[in-house]
């Protein structure tokens, strides 16, 4: 787990966008599982990104017309995973971050911290080999933030690589 800290506007989120294949670098390479994302066309880059990278967006990026469960299911559906396995994995991810009971709620009916947990569950679902987390504890209280950092650490310890962007030194120490 690599933690990145810096002042606002210093390029931390841009780094994650490039590392995650959301943006192409102006020069250089970005390798994920031995594949240079920068060398791929946008369709192939999106395919590799979907299968390999779990991204936790700073602004949650939840789809308002989908329930919490449906938001978490989406990456696996796009990967062609069977519907029964999609539902099981999404519910497990929601439980892992402590919001399984909110599965049928829509984002507008969730608090900021609950939205953040749903976004984290979506980033973790499917056992991605790379986890990119942009301020994953920003909307959480101290206790909830510690719980989420433990969840992220468990995924890293299980073999995922991760980049954490944070303003909090105590979170970077994880």
Cite the ranges covered by each PLM segment:
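ABC family nucleotide-binding domain
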Residues: 1-174
């Amino acid at each position: 787990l690599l933690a990145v800290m810096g002042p606002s506007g210093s390029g931390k989120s841009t780094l994650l966008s490039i590392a995650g294949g959301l943006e192409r670098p102006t020069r250089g390479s970005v390798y994920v599982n031995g594949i240079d994302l920068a060398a791929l066309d946008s369709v192939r880059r999106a395919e590799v990104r979907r299968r390999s990278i779990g991204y936790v967006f700073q602004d949650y990026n939840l789809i308002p017309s989908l329930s919490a469960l449906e938001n978490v299911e989406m990456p696996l559906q796009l990967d062609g995973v069977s519907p029964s396995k999609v539902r099981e994995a999404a519910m497990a991810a929601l439980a892992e971050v402590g919001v399984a009971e909110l599965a049928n709620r829509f984002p507008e009916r969730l608090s900021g911290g609950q939205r953040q947990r749903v976004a984290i569950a979506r980033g973790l679902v499917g056992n991605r080999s790379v986890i990119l987390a942009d301020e994953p504890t920003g909307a959480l209280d101290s206790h909830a933030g510690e719980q989420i950092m433990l969840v992220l650490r468990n995924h890293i310890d299980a073999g995922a690589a991760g980049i954490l962007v944070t303003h909090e030194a105590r979170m970077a120490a994880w």
